[in-house]
Structure formats: structure tokens, C-alpha cells
UniProtKB/Swiss-Prot annotation:
GO terms for molecular function: structural constituent of ribosome. It comes from Buchnera aphidicola subsp. Acyrthosiphon pisum (strain APS). It comes from the Bacteria. Pfam families: Ribosomal_L32p (PF01783). Residues 7-16 have a biased composition (Basic residues). Belongs to the bacterial ribosomal protein bL32 family. One of its GO terms (biological process) is translation. Residues 1-26 are annotated as: Disordered. Coiled coil: none annotated. Keywords: Ribonucleoprotein, Ribosomal protein. NCBIfam families: rpmF_bact. One of its GO terms (cellular component) is large ribosomal subunit. This is Large ribosomal subunit protein bL32.
Amino acid sequence: MAVQKNKPTRSKRGMRRSHDSLTAPHLSIDKFSGETHIRHHITNNGYYKGKKVI
């Protein structure tokens, strides 16, 4: 089992945690219906890039 020789510094801890933060979802407004949706996802009405897919 791997056991560390020295205690990791606060700097190393911070560097490891630098990618842990949460980001807000990137939202877009559909040009045709005016509905807000997550980018690269279909709208609630089933439209994607102005075409009905569902």
C-alpha cells in the first residue's frame, strides 16, 4: 500500500483542487422558439438547430 513520505503542502492541495469547482451550465436561446436550453442539447419542445427531432 502506498504511504506518503512527507505531508503534502497547502500549495499542492490547492493545485489538486483547482479543477473541483462547479461551473454554471452554458445556456443558449433558440432562435426559432425563443426557448432557453443547454448548449448542444435539444429544447423541451424537441427542437435542435431549428428542426423538430422528437
